[in-house]
């Protein structure tokens, strides 16, 4: 490869720039070439509507993919949970690096946990903000089953503005992704890491996707050095579940694949999935376990298998509008 700088397409948010900066450093190391960040504004960044209203699927991705297809950038970095499950033929998912913490976290007033926030008190119902129907469904279900007084409030905006709602007293707490706070150096503001048994994360949460043109074999080979096979297998299974449910990335679907080990030896992969009504009145939550997938097709099959079981239990009726 020549010494010409590689152009990395990124969203302009603080989080996206932090993620892309970390990937740029890694790509410089594996290629020996300079990498420059090219900032691109996406529809999801400029629209003030709630993601559930603007469709969710692909709103942060389309502009980056268009820039790739036009040859304005050489590769792009996405939050994998924002990536539509259908992969365009012209683009390759060249690398899925090692995943960050996939959990959701609570940032609450007075250092409180979710249970403490929702405990009956003279202050009345606790108001907890999130932009995600998936989080709303599971938080509301947990509150219902534990007798907590919690109202989930839809919010938008970047991490700073979301945490700002708590600091200003407008909300009692907000729920965010741990990985995002890690990447911008604000993890110390977390008041509780929410167990995945309480809130399953979004499919692919905490993972990054590095995409480039499918016909750029040299770049695909170089970027492949950043790929983590276990992370790729896990997120492939999670996203296969999402696709088989015919749900978009703003649907109330949670999924997490993790590896089960016997001592130091990884023996199986467990996939958990949940779908629910946003008021938390009904949840379908199931899991399946199988051999660790060794191919893309095996990982896809694990997701489809669990989706079929969830659909048989009535998952489709809980998602509102399904995508076609």
UniProtKB/Swiss-Prot annotation:
It is an enzyme of class 2 (transferase). Gene3D superfamilies: Periplasmic binding protein-like II, Porphobilinogen deaminase, C-terminal domain. Pathway: Porphyrin-containing compound metabolism; protoporphyrin-IX biosynthesis; coproporphyrinogen-III from 5-aminolevulinate: step 2/4. Its cofactor is dipyrromethane. Keywords: Porphyrin biosynthesis, Transferase. The modification S-(dipyrrolylmethanemethyl)cysteine is found at residue 249. GO terms for biological process: protoporphyrinogen IX biosynthetic process. One of its GO terms (molecular function) is hydroxymethylbilane synthase activity. Its EC number is 2.5.1.61. It holds the Pfam family Porphobil_deam. InterPro entries: HemC (IPR000860), Porphobilin_deaminase_cofac_BS (IPR022419), Porphobilin_deaminase_N (IPR022417), Porphobilinogen_deaminase_C (IPR022418), Porphobilinogen_deaminase_C_sf (IPR036803). Monomer. Tetrapolymerization of the monopyrrole PBG into the hydroxymethylbilane pre-uroporphyrinogen in several discrete steps. This is Porphobilinogen deaminase 1. It comes from Streptomyces avermitilis (strain ATCC 31267 / DSM 46492 / JCM 5070 / NBRC 14893 / NCIMB 12804 / NRRL 8165 / MA-4680).
């Amino acid at each position: 490869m020549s010494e010409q700088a590689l152009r990395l397409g990124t969203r302009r948010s603080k989080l996206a720039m932090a993620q892309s900066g970390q990937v740029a450093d890694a790509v410089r190391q594996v290629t020996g070439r300079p990498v420059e960040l090219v900032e691109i504004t996406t529809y999801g960044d400029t629209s003030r509507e709630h993601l559930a209203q603007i469709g969710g699927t692909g709103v942060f991705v389309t502009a980056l993919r268009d820039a790739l297809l036009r040859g304005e950038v050489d590769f792009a970095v996405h939050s994998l949970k924002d990536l539509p499950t259908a992969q365009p033929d012209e683009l390759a998912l060249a690398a899925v690096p090692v995943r960050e913490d996939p959990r959701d976290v609570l940032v609450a007033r007075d250092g409180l946990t979710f249970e403490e926030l929702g405990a009956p008190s003279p202050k009345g119902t606790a108001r907890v903000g999130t932009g995600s129907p998936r989080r709303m469904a599971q938080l509301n279900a947990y509150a219902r089953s534990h007798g907590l007084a919690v109202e989930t409030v839809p919010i938008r905006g970047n991490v700073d503005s979301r945490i700002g709602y708590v600091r200003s007293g407008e909300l009692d707490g907000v729920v965010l992704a741990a990985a995002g706070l890690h990447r911008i150096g604000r993890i110390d503001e977390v008041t509780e890491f929410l167990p995945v048994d309480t809130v399953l994360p979004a499919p692919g949460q905490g993972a990054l996707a590095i995409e480039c043109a499918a016909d750029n074999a040299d770049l695909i080979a170089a970027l492949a050095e950043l790929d983590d096979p276990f992370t790729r297998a896990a997120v492939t299974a999670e996203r296969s579940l999402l696709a088989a449910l015919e749900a978009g990335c703003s649907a109330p679907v949670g999924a997490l694949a993790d590896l089960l080990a016997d001592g130091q030896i990884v023996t199986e992969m467990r996939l958990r999935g949940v779908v629910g009504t946003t008021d938390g009145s009904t949840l379908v939550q199931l899991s399946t376990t199988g051999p660790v997938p060794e191919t893309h097709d095996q990982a896809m099959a694990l997701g489809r298998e669990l989706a079929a079981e969830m659909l048989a239990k009535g998952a489709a009726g809980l998602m509102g509008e399904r995508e076609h």
